[in-house]
UniProtKB/Swiss-Prot annotation:
Enzyme class: oxidoreductase
Name of this protein: Sorbitol dehydrogenase
Assembly notes: Homotetramer.
Origin organism lineage: Eukaryota, Metazoa, Chordata, Craniata, Vertebrata
Annotated gene: SORD
GO cellular component: mitochondrial membrane; motile cilium
């Protein structure tokens, strides 16, 4: 009787600008504190596409072939000798950032700021758009039975929204402005509502994206065309009847950041989530004299347990974010679809035996 064929580890690998390939990698062996995962669902992020198109994001440069993907969930296939809280068959969501050392940022609970952190699909670290992947077990979180694999993968972008709303201090009764109706804008909207925001207004250039934001839960939407930042701020105030206490800027566009400063209530907070140009011109004096606090966001920290609780309790519904699904074998087609700006969140299905959500 012929031996069963050994499974292959099909992986999506970027080699440099414009050079994206599907290749078979060796199946990794987990270390003592790691687990081997059979990947199930992995979302495509704008950073994945940027590494494909440009070969770099800022100082993070693709210098050797790198597996893409960091919005992920899967099933435990094998556990390391020291792993006690997980077992084969457990369904897990993966937090992609794992501290390499217990530095000052880890000690203060802000491990996302550690300069030596491992992060999936950030050069030189491989991601998890593949069939099999090993990860630190402490950063793999069991999914409740009522949370799907796709929801587990979406915890990564949801975590950005949680971290942004925490940084902004969103609480009961707040009016919140979200600039940008892409995936991060939409999760920021959902989290703001879950944290008690009374009204959330979302702005964007795209009418279809605003329609989706409205469908998902935005109280008000504003399509931007050729207005000045001051005019946009005036329209936001007109819609809400007052200036928002918190603005979450998810585009990184200079004009949108300017509008965010003008729009935010005196004494309020502007949270910068979107990454744009390194040098940006903003009306800083306008923020200073009105005590508008400007806070940055870099990824997230300490968000996965909260996100899982929100999903399990149905406090947020992120399922409508997924608009396209592709098997891993069609990853190149999926990336082209993303590049064309079609849909909201594209999900790649990595397990050939289970293509369900």
């Amino acid at each position: 009787m012929a031996a069963a064929a050994k499974p292959k580890n099909l992986s999506l690998v970027v080699h440099g600008p414009g050079d994206l390939r599907l290749e078979n990698y060796p199946i990794p062996e987990p270390g003592p504190n790691e687990v081997l995962l059979r990947m199930h669902s992995v979302g495509i992020c704008g950073s994945d596409v940027h590494y494909w198109e440009e070969g770099r994001i800022g100082n993070f440069i693709v210098k050797k072939p790198m597996v893409l993907g960091h919005e992920a969930s899967g099933t435990v296939e094998k556990v390391g000798s020291l792993v006690k809280h997980l077992k084969p068959g457990d369904r897990v969501a993966i937090e992609p950032g794992v501290p390499r050392e217990n530095d000052e940022f880890c000690k203060s609970g802000r491990y996302n700021l550690s300069p030596s952190i491992f992060f999936c699909a950030t050069p030189p670290d491989d991601g998890n758009l593949c069939r099999f992947y090993k990860h630190n077990a402490a950063f793999c979180y069991k999914l409740p039975d009522n949370v799907t694999f796709e929801e587990g993968a979406l915890i990564e972008p949801l975590s950005v929204g949680i971290h942004a709303c925490r940084r902004g201090g969103v609480t009961l009764g707040h009016r919140v402005l979200v600039c940008g109706a892409g995936p991060i804008g939409v999760v920021s909207l959902l989290v703001a509502k879950a944290m008690g925001a009374a009204q959330v207004v979302v702005t964007d250039l795209s009418a279809p994206r605003l329609s989706k934001a409205k469908e998902i839960g935005a109280d008000l939407v504003l399509q931007i065309s050729k207005e000045s930042p001051q005019e946009i701020a005036g329209k936001v105030e007109g819609l809400l009847g007052c200036k928002p206490e918190v603005t979450i800027e998810c585009t990184g566009a200079e004009a949108s950041i300017q509008a965010g400063i003008y729009a935010t209530r005196s004494g309020g907070t502007l949270v910068l989530v979107g990454l744009g140009s390194e040098m940006t011109t903003i009306p800083l004096l306008h923020a200073a004299v009105r005590e508008v606090d400007i806070k940055g966001v870099f990824r997230y920290c300490n968000t996965w347990p909260v996100a899982i609780s929100m999903l399990a309790s149905k406090s947020v519904n992120i399922k409508p974010l997924v608009t396209h699904r592709f098997p891993l074998e069609k990853a190149l087609e999926a990336f082209e679809t993303f590049k064309k700006g079609l849909g909201l969140k594209i999900m790649l299905k990595c397990d050939p035996n289970d293509q369900n959500p």
